[in-house]
Amino acid sequence: MNPLAQPIIYPTIFTGTLITALSSHWFFAWLGLEMNMLAFIPVLTKKTSPRSTEAAIKYFLTQATASMILLMAILYNNMLSGQWTTTNTTNPYSSLMIVTALAMKLGMAPFHFWVPEVTQGVPLTSGLLLLTWQKLAPISIMYQMSSSVDTNILLTLSILSILVGGWGGLNQTQLRKILAYSSITHMGWMMAVLPYNPDITILNLIIYIILTTTAFLILDLNSSVTILMLTRTWNKLTWLMPLIPSTLLSLGGLPPLTGFLPKWAIIEEFAKNGNLITPTIMAIITLLNLYFYVRLIYATSITLLPMSNNAKMKWQFENTKPTPLLPTLTILTTLLLPISPLILSIS
């Protein structure tokens, strides 16, 4: 990507997300999504290669299809009700089409196929933006129309996303694909609680962004994209070794780490509404995610693979990239659970 284009592209992405998040008019919400999508495509092709070009095309085709479905649903809803406000979506068919379009944009199952492939084909920084920032605009629309969404449809999509996210990540060796499937699982948890308490969805989104950003910063600092490359962290960046297990376990939702907080809040919210079967199923399926994270920790931090003498610990370490955010994010990734009563009272 041309460096001269960056001062235009990144503000456009930010502006598009902001327009969608702050708009209560369907046309401006759709316009913000389009600005965001078109400006994000050059970010995916930041490092020109056939793989990144393929990823950008897949992203564009999926997002364009979702945008067409969304626009058709908006026009259909306006034809029936005469309203353009995002909170007034009472027709079940238009609501179903809107949820389908936004699920495609979020990468929820069964519209998830593009997420692992696009994440795998782009650099780590672009993958981080894809799995974090690009979720904000669609979730903001879902938040505004949470009272008019069919609960059964959302729960079906959520359980399916959690299942696909856990099942799909089991046989992966590429770290970007593992984080992509983890993102699908987290989207399932967020959307499951949306009809009951949208504020917990926002809390889950914030914690998810913190955890995913920490994981991507560690991988970028270590220049690791596969499990094998991550196993060599001990002889390059020894000080990074304690951070890897804590971050991965928190992503898997293991107590008493921060990643358990949103799951705890969601299960509690379901229990308040008299629904115990759904969170039980979701929690059991999420063990698949925890399993492949524990397996990843076992390969990187507990076992030491046979290596030649050239791979022994270096007497002089390489200069590392400056990471001013990593210490703060690591603390937030591991130590937020003790103050969870305060966080839940605010939300």
Curated annotation (Swiss-Prot):
Its EC number(s): 7.1.1.2
Catalytic function, reaction form: a ubiquinone + NADH + 5 H(+)(in) = a ubiquinol + NAD(+) + 4 H(+)(out)
Record carries keyword Protein biosynthesis: no
Keyword Membrane: yes
Residues that span the membrane, as ranges: 13-33, 55-75, 96-116, 122-142, 151-171, 178-198, 199-219, 237-257, 274-294, 326-346
Matching InterPro entries: Complex_I_Subunit_2, NADH_DH_su2_C, NADH_UbQ_OxRdtase_chain2, ND/Mrp_TM
Annotated GO CC locations: mitochondrial inner membrane; respiratory chain complex I
Membrane topology value: Multi-pass membrane protein
UniProtKB keywords: Electron transport, Membrane, Mitochondrion, Mitochondrion inner membrane, NAD, Respiratory chain, Translocase, Transmembrane, Transmembrane helix, Transport, Ubiquinone
Biological role stated in the UniProt entry: Core subunit of the mitochondrial membrane respiratory chain NADH dehydrogenase (Complex I) which catalyzes electron transfer from NADH through the respiratory chain, using ubiquinone as an electron acceptor. Essential for the catalytic activity and assembly of complex I.
Assembly mode: Core subunit of respiratory chain NADH dehydrogenase (Complex I) which is composed of 45 different subunits. Interacts with TMEM242.
UniProt record similarity statement: Belongs to the complex I subunit 2 family.
Name this protein carries in UniProt: NADH-ubiquinone oxidoreductase chain 2
